Amino acid sequence: MQQKILILDFGSQYTQLIARRIREANVYCELHSWDVSDAFIREFNPAGVILSGGPNSVYEDETPRAPQSVFELGVPVLGICYGMQTMAAQLGGSVENAAKREFGYAEIRAQGHSALLKGIQDKSNAEGHGLLDVWMSHGDKVTALPEGFKIIASNSATPIAGMADENRRFYAVQFHPEVTHTKQGKALLNRFVHDICGCDQSWNMPDYVETAVQRIREEVGCDEVILGLSGGVDSSVAAALIHRAIGDQLTCVFVDNGLLRLNEAEQVMETFGKNLGVKVIHVDASAKFLGDLSGVNDPEAKRKIIGREFVEVFQQEAAKLPQAKWLAQGTIYPDVIESAGAKTKKAHTIKSHHNVGGLPDTLKLKLLEPLRELFKDEVRELGIALGLPHDMVYRHPFPGPGLGVRILGEVKREYADLLRQADHIFIEELRSTKDADGKSWYDKTSQAFAVFLPVKSVGVMGDGRTYDYVVALRAVVTTDFMTAHWAELPYDLLGKVSNRIINEVRGINRVVYDISGKPPATIEWE
């Protein structure tokens, strides 16, 4: 019988990161809403249960609670943030609003020699106590322990930052071990699933491919599927996976919306149509997209328009395929969670995505999203397992709305043409510039692109005054795209990119570099 971990989702923005960390530990896990039935939990038969964080307060009326059967199964349970608070409240402890909230980095002291934290530390203090650098995000705190529990972590702001009932193997932490900012978070989760729950390392990507292929075949049957192919990593891997499952039942639709990267249409048709043998229909809808975007400044409105146009094009192409019943998309989990599209519908909305927002009620095709619960690094790993070329799989992500969300405000063909050229120069220089170990800066960064700013600045070229547009460069380093650090590119590289853009792209006379992290900023500007 396969060992597996059940994650109950209370609506945190970070919930799927828990699943990602468990999968990295080669343990199978599934994420389900907090309100699943007791019968489901018993049938699932987990080796352990993790309660996620969430935006609610346990002392308010009608807030989520873990099914009571979770605490009656006799298996280990780990509560994280809100998961700790609901565990405490449900088992007889107390939770109150914190006078001092904690958001961001914090240092906690491990204590009590718990099975969860023993030997896990970043450093120690003068007394020899283990200290951990962690990521906090809470406005409430546990103020009284349930019977049988002891404190296993604390700091001055949160005296009960961790608790444990060793006899029942119930553990909880107020911080978020699933985010990369908690340096020992992976070690903590590995300790829980391997040592405390007793799971072995039996789950891997080849197994996932086999499972996903079988699931697609069962879901689709003999129907035909159309997929919106952008040439980006997500849609490319989705196409390869679906093609592996159903072959020529898949038809890819490549839509040129006028918002693509330089020479992208030609590259996509060459790669998929000729090299991979996938059926691809090329639709040039650039005039329609740009026309509908004329005069629209609001980023959410732009995303909705772009999403609507994509769906309309797919519907038109589907009408030419009488057996087409499914619209496939390369939606991945960060798309879903940033649109509050998680299963609980509790996560706070940050921005909508064309894959998960903007789909009209009149859509006559069923949605097939085989990558919906995978993170970007898992999608890349899946692509390699499917035999896709390395350069394709490790290409930087490109948003579904394309340059439409990299042009601030109104989208015009002139702006798109300028941005295309600037972005191409930036990526070209990142690819050709190597560090001391011979690795390109393109490979060292997770995502890099240019952003068009619809403002003009004064400049001088030769003996003449210029009054032209501004471009911002954005490059980040991340493992999961839920949090990210700005990339510390060499000054000489930035200088060369700036010089080339200003000299080669007529209409741009100033280049700036974005040094914002995520959070507080998102990776894309819109």
From Swiss-Prot:
Keywords: ATP-binding, Glutamine amidotransferase, GMP biosynthesis, Ligase, Nucleotide-binding, Purine biosynthesis
Cellular component GO terms held in the UniProt record: cytosol
Origin: domain of life: Bacteria
GMPS ATP-PPase domain boundaries: 203-395
Keyword Metal-binding: no
Catalytic residues (UniProt): 81 (nucleophile), 176, 178
Broadest EC class assigned to this enzyme: ligase
Positions of the Glutamine amidotransferase type-1 domain: 4-202
Pathway where this protein functions: Purine metabolism; GMP biosynthesis; GMP from XMP (L-Gln route): step 1/1
CDD domains (alphabetical): GATase1_GMP_Synthase (cd01742), GMP_synthase_C (cd01997)
Matching InterPro entries: Class_I_gatase-like, GATASE, GMP_synth_C, GMP_synth_GATase, GMP_synthase, GMPS_ATP_PPase_dom, NAD/GMP_synthase, Rossmann-like_a/b/a_fold
E.C. number: 6.3.5.2
Primary role: Catalyzes the synthesis of GMP from XMP.
Subunit description: Homodimer.
PANTHER family: GMP SYNTHASE [GLUTAMINE-HYDROLYZING], GMP SYNTHASE-RELATED
UniProt protein name: GMP synthase [glutamine-hydrolyzing]
